[in-house]
From Swiss-Prot:
UniProt-annotated location(s): Mitochondrion
Presequence positions on this chain: 1-32
UniProt-recorded name of the protein: Large ribosomal subunit protein uL6m
Signal peptide extent: none
Any one of the GO CC terms: mitochondrial large ribosomal subunit
Annotated function: Component of the mitochondrial ribosome (mitoribosome), a dedicated translation machinery responsible for the synthesis of mitochondrial genome-encoded proteins, including at least some of the essential transmembrane subunits of the mitochondrial respiratory chain. The mitoribosomes are attached to the mitochondrial inner membrane and translation products are cotranslationally integrated into the membrane.
Species: Schizosaccharomyces pombe (strain 972 / ATCC 24843) (Fission yeast)
Disulfide bridge positions per record: none
One GO-annotated biological process of the protein: mitochondrial translation
Quaternary data: Component of the mitochondrial large ribosomal subunit (mt-LSU). Mature yeast 74S mitochondrial ribosomes consist of a small (37S) and a large (54S) subunit. The 37S small subunit contains a 15S ribosomal RNA (15S mt-rRNA) and at least 32 different proteins. The 54S large subunit contains a 21S rRNA (21S mt-rRNA) and at least 45 different proteins.
Keywords: Mitochondrion, Ribonucleoprotein, Ribosomal protein, RNA-binding, rRNA-binding, Transit peptide
InterPro entries: Ribosomal_uL6-like, Ribosomal_uL6-like_a/b-dom_sf, Ribosomal_uL6_a/b-dom, Ribosomal_uL6_bac-type, Ribosomal_uL6_CS
Length: 213
């Protein structure tokens, strides 16, 4: 296992993996633009790369992600970069360039998650709509005959600051946003009165009622 932070800081550390048996085609250089963008990394973040598995550890926890072996990772002071060896980049396939940008985006999200959490805010809009927490579950009173009971995932934290709002937090952005979408699905905002469950500042998209003459 390699640890970036355990190595000398006098020069960039780069993990380079040999390229074997790849087929290459041309593609737009724009696909690699996102991949080349730098990531600002706090001092208390640790990276460990073993094979195609990259582990990111910070004050709020640890995340693991796939890191393709045709990419390399370098860190100088607080700057982290995802790159390709020059001879690979010249002939990289469209899929490889797309994965370069995707890998960089996921890595940036994971760094933010273990540093300061991802957050999603849920708001209930409707007369009598209420929500509460009990025994690891969210209770939703949203106009049905029975309350909706939603189990809280172990890797998502939930707060209930008001009777009509929830705050979701977690280190994994995808899990936080997926759970927010699940909660919203129980009462999607309706287009005439605006009742429903709203996520992250979502605004009502109201339709005008048609009059019958």
């Amino acid at each position: 296992m390699f640890s970036i932070d355990s190595c000398l800081k006098t020069r960039p550390l780069t993990f380079r993996i040999a390229r074997l048996g790849m087929n290459f085609t041309t593609c737009s250089a724009a696909r690699s633009y996102v991949g080349k963008k730098e990531i600002i990394v706090p001092k208390n973040i640790q990276f460990d790369l073993e094979g195609e598995q990259l582990q990111i550890t910070g004050p709020h926890g640890t995340l693991n992600m796939r890191f393709p072996n045709y990419l390399n990772l370098s860190k100088t002071n607080d700057i982290l970069k995802v790159g390709m060896d020059a001879n690979i980049e010249k002939q990289a396939t469209k899929k490889q360039r797309a994965m370069w940008g995707t890998t960089r985006a996921i890595l940036a999200n994971n760094v933010k998650g273990v540093t300061m959490y991802w957050q999603s805010i849920i708001k209930l809009v409707g007369i009598g709509y209420r929500t509460s927490l009990n025994d690891g579950n969210i209770h939703l009173k949203i106009g049905y005959a029975n309350d909706i009971l939603v189990s809280i995932p172990t890797d998502v934290q939930v707060e209930n600051p008001t009777p009509t709002s929830l705050v979701l937090r977690g280190i994994d952005r995808q899990k936080v946003t997926q759970f927010a979408a699940k909660i919203r699905s129980f009462k999607k905002p309706e287009p005439y009165k605006g009742k429903g469950i709203y996520v992250d500042g979502e605004k009502p998209q109201l339709k005008a009622k048609r009059s019958i003459s």
